[in-house]
Amino acid sequence: MALLNRDDWYDIARDVDWTLSYVDRAVAFPEEWKGEKDICGTAWDDWDEPFRVSFREYVMVQRDKEASVGAIREAMVRAKAYEKLDDGHKATSHLHMGTITMVEHMAVTMQSRFVRFAPSARWRSLGAFGMLDETRHTQLDLRFSHDLLNDSPSFDWSQRAFHTDEWAVLATRNLFDDIMLNADCVEAALATSLTLEHGFTNIQFVALASDAMEAGDVNFSNLLSSIQTDEARHAQLGFPTLDVMMKHDPKRAQQILDVAFWRSYRIFQAVTGVSMDYYTPVAKRQMSFKEFMLEWIVKHHERILRDYGLQKPWYWDTFEKTLDHGHHALHIGTWFWRPTLFWDPNGGVSREERRWLNQKYPNWEESWGVLWDEIISNINAGNIEKTLPETLPMLCNVTNLPIGSHWDRFHLKPEQLVYKGRLYTFDSDVSKWIFELDPERYAGHTNVVDRFIGGQIQPMTIEGVLNWMGLTPEVMGKDVFNYRWAGDYAENRIAAE
């Protein structure tokens, strides 16, 4: 008997829905999970996915992708290819696996909520594929990290990180807890699927895959590319959701996108910007973080806003100016507080690297070069202790990132407000605005510095903080090249003398 064409039965299978008689629909689909608010239920009949796939087709495609990833993985592991890679590039894979692996696992929960609570039967059906995608991504990352555990204990943090209170992990976890797990289905689709996955994930996977291939890390590059093909598909779920929202509640859609864009951007400054402009070997860099942002994010997001009749975020001019600086601030901050990291950062300011940075960022020297000059001077004088922290940085109560890290060193003034007797500090007026939109959403959270001042961390020393974060000597961050890049300047000075 011949198989029916997919189009003959697809709509029937996709649109299967519950006919409730023993329970009220509002109980089966609580508003706090569904998130449709004042949009009537029939409006979601217009929700129509931009791709069509049957389970049979899905399995066939995923099987082929798994076979490809597995074959390359086995070949690279047998060839011990990882051992031959540049140490700076290795920091990228440590950072990525530690901050992203459990995010993929969190996304399984988000997609499962789509399956159960989304206001459209079509959306619920397609959420099943997203749930399978994210399960696959989690397992791929864990398998990659497990293969390389003997090469570096930092890979243990692919699973361990989100069970610790390491400060970078807290910042990442706080964002994804908020937009994936705390958000209702509608907000999660716009904030995660549309803004994060369809936009910023392109940087994390496309850009890093390209840089990894240039660096000779075929295994990591292939892994990222395989995951990105899934992300590109299920990230499309945000568009039909936005279609419905623009017809019935465009103001809410605008606000969700504006908040999600800024929060996602700040985290990706730390995760992707630092990796692209400092950890990737300079000869292997395809483009700068700013260039990639302008090409893939700015044009992309502007096009979405324009096509759907939305406005640019009110902070867009500030955002564009920070492209020249924010990730440089986060890099010098993470390098300085390197003992608080679970990976070994690269200073990334040898003479050759510095020429590249000045070429890509004409104002880099004025804002950051002078600070690195002081660090280099201390290193070459043997005063390593002066390049290490004695206390903690002030952190933003929304992004959980250091104050002064969103722009250049001439824009360090924190924003502050008092809410219910507690003083809150923010890295920018944008983060303060986000807090003021929904104070109760953020007011209960305490960052590392809040907990330190509150006496939750004992003893109240750097050593006490490191122990509280779960950092052990074998993974505690140190300069990945043992400061060899600083020798560039010492040798030239001696030669001149």
From Swiss-Prot:
Binds 2 Fe(2+) ions per subunit. The two iron ions could form a binuclear cluster. The keyword NAD applies. InterPro entries: Ferritin-like_SF, Phenol_Hydrox, RNR-like, YHS_dom. It catalyses: propene + NADH + O2 + H(+) = 1,2-epoxypropane + NAD(+) + H2O. Its cofactor is Fe(2+). Pfam families: Phenol_Hydrox (PF02332), YHS (PF04945). GO terms for cellular component: cytoplasm. Fe cation 1 binds at E104, E134, H137, E231. It is found in: Cytoplasm. GO terms for molecular function: alkene monooxygenase activity; metal ion binding. Fe cation 2 binds at E134, E197, E231, H234. Belongs to the TmoA/XamoA family. This is Alkene monooxygenase system, oxygenase component subunit alpha. It comes from Xanthobacter autotrophicus (strain ATCC BAA-1158 / Py2). The lineage of its organism: Bacteria, Pseudomonadati, Pseudomonadota, Alphaproteobacteria, Hyphomicrobiales. The gene is xamoA.
